[in-house]
Amino acid sequence: MTNIRKTHPLLKIINSSFVDLPAPSSLSSWWNFGSLLGVCLGVQILTGLFLAMHYTSDTATAFNSVTHICRDVNYGWLLRYLHANGASMFFICLYLHVGRGLYYGSYTYSETWNIGILLLFAVMATAFMGYVLPWGQMSFWGATVITNLLSAIPYIGTDLVQWIWGGFSVDKATLTRFFAFHFLFPFIVTALVMVHLLFLHETGSNNPTGIPSDPDMIPFHPYYTIKDILGFLVMLTALATLVLFSPDLLGDPDNYIPANPLMTPPHIKPEWYFLFAYAILRSIPNKLGGVLALVMSILILAIVPILHMSKQRSMMFRPLSQCLFWLLVAVLFTLTWIGGQPVEHPYIIIGQMASVLYFLIILFLMPMISLVENYLLKW
């Protein structure tokens, strides 16, 4: 008799995606982050759902409702900090996942890559709106500053900002709609994840060598299910450690002060995972130029496949490209640090140099060094 998992209309989809899926035999731990992102999304949706049961999206009560969750709801503090730090784990896994794609040339699967970029934007939008909901000082001023950037769009900018705000400033209407969208977006992300996987399974996984692995495939289960479960345990242990020992390590103390439109915090900055983009935004003195640079800092990923000049797919056997890749990582760490610093000397010039270097590496140095490597290998 044929196994039910191979015949049942629903089970056979799951079977072909997670059980009998042929996978390259050489996948390293860098291929764990896709499944880790799935776990992060699950944790965020579950904790978010329970938080939404107790949260009120009204300017008068939002801050107090979060305090109520932490103090009076059974394990409310755990839900709140799992959700807040779960977002940080989400972005750590996201950036490592994207970095893996850049290093091993996974971007040559253009459909999967482009859906991934769309997912990155969707998750960033969700996280930004979620940060506004506790209605602390940094929530309010972060929302004001970031939404205000849209006013840089010529002609329609001011009207667009007021339309998003639902008035002439960030107020009750803004908070209510941000809550509605923050609740909705994770489900859109889940749908996009399914499309992402659909396109991935059309081509099959890449592998560290970048060489087609068709002659050497192994079933996903049990080999990679076990490997993924180990990844889950490591990540959930890290998350539990963060939540139970220093839950406010990655947050901003200003967000424990209720939102006050009459008092600006000394340094307005977003959560740590947006600081690199924020540093690029601030490094350009022109408002519209800064906004364009901010968008391009992520959107530049979409043209990476076009800029691939190497005859080899992966960087595994390309030491010169590896040096540039790790320089890019160092630049991103520098930008993250600068984004959290005040706008004064010497941080301004460091931020500007790092921003220029970021675009220079991706747009010019990477393709040029690839051509040099091709020449050295007589290709």
Swiss-Prot record:
A GO term for molecular function: metal ion binding
InterPro entries listed in its UniProt record: Cyt_b/b6_C, Cyt_b/b6_C_sf, Cyt_b/b6_N, Cytb/b6-like_sf, Cytochrome_b, Cytochrome_b_C_euk/bac, Cytochrome_b_N_euk/bac, Di-haem_cyt_TM
Membrane topology summary: Multi-pass membrane protein
Compartment(s) of residence: Mitochondrion inner membrane
GO biological process, one term: mitochondrial electron transport, ubiquinol to cytochrome c
Gene Ontology CC terms: mitochondrial inner membrane; respiratory chain complex III
Co-factor requirement: heme b
Binding note for cofactor: Binds 2 heme b groups non-covalently.
Source organism, top-level taxon: Eukaryota
Transmembrane region(s): 33-53, 77-98, 113-133, 178-198, 226-246, 288-308, 320-340, 347-367
Keyword Electron transport attached: yes
Residues binding heme b b562, per UniProt: 83, 182
Alphabetical UniProt keywords: Electron transport, Heme, Iron, Membrane, Metal-binding, Mitochondrion, Mitochondrion inner membrane, Respiratory chain, Transmembrane, Transmembrane helix, Transport, Ubiquinone
Main location: mitochondrion
Binding site for heme b b566: 97, 196
Residues annotated as binding a ubiquinone: 201
Misc remark: Heme 1 (or BL or b562) is low-potential and absorbs at about 562 nm, and heme 2 (or BH or b566) is high-potential and absorbs at about 566 nm.
Family the entry assigns: Belongs to the cytochrome b family.
Subunit and partners: The cytochrome bc1 complex contains 11 subunits: 3 respiratory subunits (MT-CYB, CYC1 and UQCRFS1), 2 core proteins (UQCRC1 and UQCRC2) and 6 low-molecular weight proteins (UQCRH/QCR6, UQCRB/QCR7, UQCRQ/QCR8, UQCR10/QCR9, UQCR11/QCR10 and a cleavage product of UQCRFS1). This cytochrome bc1 complex then forms a dimer.
Function: Component of the ubiquinol-cytochrome c reductase complex (complex III or cytochrome b-c1 complex) that is part of the mitochondrial respiratory chain. The b-c1 complex mediates electron transfer from ubiquinol to cytochrome c. Contributes to the generation of a proton gradient across the mitochondrial membrane that is then used for ATP synthesis.
Protein name from the UniProt record: Cytochrome b
